[in-house]
Amino acid sequence: METNIVEVENFVQQSEERRGSAFTQEVKRYLERYPNTQYVDVLLTDLNGCFRGKRIPVSSLKKLEKGCYFPASVFAMDILGNVVEEAGLGQEMGEPDRTCVPVLGSLTPSAADPEFIGQMLLTMVDEDGAPFDVEPRNVLNRLWQQLRQRGLFPVVAVELEFYLLDRQRDAEGYLQPPCAPGTDDRNTQSQVYSVDNLNHFADVLNDIDELAQLQLIPADGAVAEASPGQFEINLYHTDNVLEACDDALALKRLVRLMAEKHKMHATFMAKPYEEHAGSGMHIHISMQNNRGENVLSDAEGEDSPLLKKMLAGMIDLMPSSMALLAPNVNSYRRFQPGMYVPTQASWGHNNRTVALRIPCGDRHNHRVEYRVAGADANPYLVMAAIFAGILHGLDNELPLQEEVEGNGLEQEGLPFPIRQSDALGEFIENDHLRRYLGERFCHVYHACKNDELLQFERLITETEIEWMLKNA
């Protein structure tokens, strides 16, 4: 198997000898540390950021060295796991299998049962041995490599917001916050940064933290967020972009499983409550040269010309990237005034009302916080949209709009599409995105999300019946 790019030590692109040796050593070390392991979940990540895979007996793990097979159509599934034939990866191709190989370094205990079950990521390769170009992880890797080839090395961190929910709906059938464990005290107030809220849910939050450490997820602990039952967990910054997204998805799975253990639900749905803030996925990004120096500021700590190019590119592609940043119908309910979320493409310093925020810090920590994506988005694709914007800014002479000062929600800016249908239209029509992300990926993603939208629009809701039954 030939390698396409040698700069990034990507597991798929190593020689078979080196890969086999590294895999064998990883399995050996893991089983020495976790000798009671009986099964291993081998996992691919689909377009929606959902894990697809199977559970194999630990005796079969070493056979994974040369890969296993999954259908290519796993990357043409809707949110419910149904293959979307319009994407062209299913029956039209004869439902072909493709080889999937382990991602080196991803073998960890599973949050489902860490003593007896492990988990390992897979990545798909095409018939010619190249990375399968529709897999979100491979889409991101290709863009990451392009930046590295230009001598630019991103350092990123992911922040994720989520809600803990009661398993029981309220009297009207709506979602509701959980009671504090062991009490009948249901928090209905917004208490951002409340330590008391952390204490009330210490058992589940501590379990999340302990399992994150066991899985080597570099999490920074939980913060009580703006709404009842809402929390945020931040991941430490890293220069391994793929691992940052691997960890974000592993964390989402872990949080859900730990909530179930404590008789609650956890959701990363963008907007579970009409009256409360939604949940976002914020990405912090800085850029280094090959000497490890931050190149987003000059010697005086001011914004560098490179940063301004990056900002211009990210802003220009942001509206067309909304289909990736807000991937579901519910995602667009999050973009409302007064809900701590930007509603147009904008930038500014130390300003949480803009889409691209440059936080406080010295020149060594100069970075951008990309504040648009929902927690329901696929982190590989959010990061890919960001990198596409950065490359777009580097490749073209784009004007940078004026910095926003004050409340960016009340000022003129480049608006986002506010409906999924509009976002999908802008996405598929953007030549720059198709070039950076790949024609086939864009076709498959658009087909799958458009099919989901059509399914949703065929549904007849209780609200429609209530409004129209006697009034139409």
Curated annotation (Swiss-Prot):
The lineage of its organism: Bacteria, Pseudomonadati, Pseudomonadota, Gammaproteobacteria, Enterobacterales. Pathway: Amine and polyamine degradation; putrescine degradation; 4-aminobutanoate from putrescine: step 1/4. It catalyses: putrescine + L-glutamate + ATP = gamma-L-glutamylputrescine + ADP + phosphate + H(+). Belongs to the glutamine synthetase family. Residues 35-129 form the GS beta-grasp domain. This is Gamma-glutamylputrescine synthetase PuuA. Requires Mg(2+), that can be substituted by Mn(2+). Its cofactor is Mg(2+); Mn(2+). It comes from Escherichia coli (strain K12). Its EC number is 6.3.1.11. It comes from the Bacteria. GO terms for molecular function: ATP binding; glutamate-putrescine ligase activity; glutamine synthetase activity. InterPro entries: Gln_synt_N (IPR008147), Gln_synt_N_sf (IPR036651), Gln_synth/guanido_kin_cat_dom (IPR014746), Gln_synth_cat_dom (IPR008146), Gln_synth_gly_rich_site (IPR027303).
